[in-house]
Amino acid sequence: MRINYLDDDDLAFLPECSEAHLEAFTRILTHGENGKPRLSSTLLRNETFLAMEGHPERYRRNWQLIAGELQHFGGDSIANTLRRHGKFYRAILLDVCKRLKAKVDKQLSTPQIEQQLLAHFLQHSWNKLNAEQKAQFLAAVECRSHELDSLMAHLLRHRKLSEGVTLLLDERLTAILRTHAAVSVIGHGLVRGAGLNSVKAVSGSAYRVTIPAVLHIACLRQMLQPPSDTAEIGEKYPARS
């Protein structure tokens, strides 16, 4: 299967990531939470990607195919077919911000918007956890502080941001998607009889893929930054309610 990758400056950093980190990110795109391959994945049917199975740099050498897969999932499925490619990452990022109700400044750079999204997600997810879940989370990321600002700094300082976000997604993604599904049903009712306006509501972005994928991309970018740059995320870009 052919994957048409849009040349995207916001994804050009991917080959700088470690092979292990890229493999973990790719699995978000290609496999569901139950571990089963996604039927909608084009990457798992791509001959070039399949031919490199077992190669020590399979993911880094195919980063454009992986990025194209994300763009594919971020675009409207019908529109993808017509234009033969997906959406730029920034558009996907802003779409996820809207879905998670993260109020971000669209005039900022993509990395800055990602930082606002991460701060929003960590704050709101943390507040939804019960005492037992918080204790399990803190133990998993090896943090003793229950204060959110200290937790953010800890995740960044010890390079556990991706792990922390993944753990929170395991707890919160189902609830997030349930809310999205309810909104979608209401939306479908509102646009019924509106002709082509209803098509986008039915065939829109695959949020089960794009929400964790965008959060993971944001983590990967943060982890590549020097500690002095990442330590300010909680202070410089507090979650906006």
Give the positions of each predicted feature:
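Phosphate-binding glycine-rich loops and adjacent basic patches that engage nucleotide phosphates
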Residues: G54-Y59, A131-A139, L177-H180
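Membrane-active amphipathic alpha-helices
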Residues: L117-L156
